[in-house]
């Protein structure tokens, strides 16, 4: 699998230069079972991650949810991103249409550090949130997103 960086370089996903290029703690994890996302963009707030992980009594780690974007909300209110469904949201230079809540699967039970299953996080998400946490979106305007970029709701759905 090839990854294309924002400046156009291409790397095999296992190439150690990819982590150096991205400047983050990138880690590739091989799972025995396949996993996929239903939409191109997955957004979750750190407040949502914290609330659900606290309920499940597991360390608060957004990697369990495999999002493309983690946002810090000024309000600190968990699940606020649910209200964005139907909205156009600017994240950095990109605009994303928030299409629907993100239905979670068993992979949230996998410890991102060890790759081993073992938590009851999905059970908590299922009972507390109808198995949804975060939102799925579609890119309307491609653009660069950087850590710390503002998140602005540009258009809300009409009531």
Residue ranges and their predicted role:
Residues 1-159:
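Metal-cofactor-dependent catalytic cores
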């Amino acid at each position: 699998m090839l990854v294309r960086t924002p400046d156009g370089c291409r790397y095999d996903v296992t190439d150690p230069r990819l982590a150096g290029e991205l400047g983050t703690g990138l880690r590739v994890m091989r799972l025995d079972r396949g996993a996929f996302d239903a939409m191109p963009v997955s957004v979750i707030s750190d407040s949502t991650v914290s609330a659900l992980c606290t309920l499940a009594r597991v360390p608060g780690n957004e990697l369990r949810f495999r999002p493309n974007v983690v946002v810090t909300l000024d309000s600190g209110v968990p699940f606020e991103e649910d209200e964005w469904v139907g909205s156009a949201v600017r994240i950095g230079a990109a605009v994303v249409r928030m299409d629907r809540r993100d239905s979670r699967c068993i992979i949230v039970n996998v410890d991102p550090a060890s790759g081993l299953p073992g938590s009851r996080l999905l059970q908590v998400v299922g009972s507390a949130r109808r198995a949804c946490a975060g939102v799925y979106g579609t890119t309307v305007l491609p653009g660069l997103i950087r850590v710390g970029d503002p998140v602005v709701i540009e258009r809300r759905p009409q009531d």
